[in-house]
Amino acid sequence: MALQNIGASNRNDAFYRYKMPKMVTKTEGKGNGIKTNIINNVEIAKALARPPSYTTKYFGCELGAQSKFDEKTGTSLVNGAHNTSKLAGLLENFIKKFVQCYGCGNPETEIIITKTQMVNLKCAACGFISEVDMRDKLTNFILKNPPEQKKVSKDKKAMRKAEKERLKEGELADEEQRKLKAKKKALSNGKDSKTSKNHSSDEDISPKHDENALEVDEDEDDDDGVEWQTDTSREAAEKRMMEQLSAKTAEMVMLSAMEVEEKKAPKSKSNGNVVKTENPPPQEKNLVQDMKEYLKKGSPISALKSFISSLSEPPQDIMDALFNALFDGVGKGFAKEVTKKKNYLAAAATMQEDGSQMHLLNSIGTFCGKNGNEEALKEVALVLKALYDQDIIEEEVVLDWYEKGLTGADKSSPVWKNVKPFVEWLQSAESESEEED
């Protein structure tokens, strides 16, 4: 069967990966009973990820004719004689209105019916939600015959929960194995000690001999001390003087070292604060510059972790520097830039088990709020949605970050107002999943 690109705008793209079969029609009947049969309508609808009844109904609405789709046989009929080119043109209009994303033009979309009975298209490629014109006649048919929803978000949450449970079980199993190994070592050490006591009588005797020897040595040392005190010869006196001098010189060296450390300490601190915090802007600029130079080298993303771990600055400062280096000067189109460079953020967000995602969210808030980037501030919700869809940030961390921000020192920041729709969406999705469970 011949294939063609989905969408008239992609007709001449030889490398376009979204394809559908070319339409094949057949005219049946005569007179008033003449009908047009769209033979491969089921295959076309399958390629578009839409029910075949939608395309059949759309042809009938646009042509002002009765249409019928038989679910059992897969037959699509439209009353009247219509040529293939005319129906193919109507199909292109259907694709443009009900299949392609209004943002990126990608046909990989899903029909979503909102609580307010509005038909939207959710793009799996860019995440854009397109609002379909509800004045179209087909929208009423879609509301009455909604498509089967793919529970992608629920599956993701279930997989995440299962993954967390699996990790916890693995940690518990590791702890149990460690305990078993420790018990085995203790038992083996006990057995070795028993066997050594039973089979080596010489070893039982030798400790007593050593103890006696030590006692003799101590007595000899005591005797030596008495001899030194009673020995008044010139050689003994000189020896004692040398020992005293060596002890005094050692004390003097220790005192001088302590004085040097005390002198150095005030230089590193001032009023309880490290000098590093007294003049942060130049150091932050240097850190951002280092990040930019590293990114210009074109090093693989896998090497980013080792580079970050080699830095001595606090984790939050490192994340701020990386974010500024990646998106310096970006305003409009901030969400698209984040999607392009998501791999860098994913690598940075997995540096630590706890805290890296929070550092990333703080960097986003600083970049959009404190820096006064109004264009980026408008797209902050889209940025969080993109990172959430890519599993770079988790729902619990976002909610925790939002709650702390509303009650923290930066509660007046405009970031929280722009983030609120995304947070409400997360909370509503969570409540719906709990109700269904």
From Swiss-Prot:
Q: Where is the composition biased (Basic and acidic residues)?
A: 148-179, 191-212
Per UniProt, where does GTP bind?
29-36
PTM sites of type Phosphothreonine: 230
**Residue spans of biased composition, Acidic residues class:** 213-226
Check the record and name the InterPro entries matching this protein.
ARM-type_fold (IPR016024), IF2/IF5 (IPR045196), Transl_init_fac_IF2/IF5_dom (IPR002735), Transl_init_fac_IF2/IF5_N (IPR016189), Transl_init_fac_IF2/IF5_Zn-bd (IPR016190), W2_domain (IPR003307)
Where's the W2 domain? 278-436
Q: Which residues carry this modification: Phosphoserine?
A: 201, 428, 431, 433
State a single Gene Ontology molecular function: translation initiation factor activity
Pfam families named in the record: eIF-5_eIF-2B (PF01873), W2 (PF02020)
What about PTM? Phosphorylated at Ser-201, Thr-230, Ser-428, Ser-431, and Ser-433 by CK2.
What Gene3D superfamilies does UniProt report for this protein, alphabetically? Answer: 1.25.40.180, 2.20.25.350, 3.30.30.170
| Xref: CDD domains | W2_eIF5 (cd11561)
Region feature Disordered, mapped onto this chain: 148-231, 262-284
User: What positions belong to coiled-coil segments?
Assistant: none
One GO location term (cellular component): cytoplasm
Q: Is Nucleotide-binding one of the keywords?
A: yes
Q: Does the keyword Coiled coil apply?
A: no
Lineage top rank: taxon:
Eukaryota
Alphabetical UniProt keywords:
GTP-binding, Initiation factor, Nucleotide-binding, Phosphoprotein, Protein biosynthesis
Functionally, this protein is described as follows:
Catalyzes the hydrolysis of GTP bound to the 40S ribosomal initiation complex (40S.mRNA.Met-tRNA[F].eIF-2.GTP) with the subsequent joining of a 60S ribosomal subunit resulting in the release of eIF-2 and the guanine nucleotide. The subsequent joining of a 60S ribosomal subunit results in the formation of a functional 80S initiation complex (80S.mRNA.Met-tRNA[F]).
Protein family (similarity comment): Belongs to the eIF-2-beta/eIF-5 family.
Protein name in UniProt: Probable eukaryotic translation initiation factor 5-2
Query: In which organism is this protein found?
Result: Arabidopsis thaliana (Mouse-ear cress)
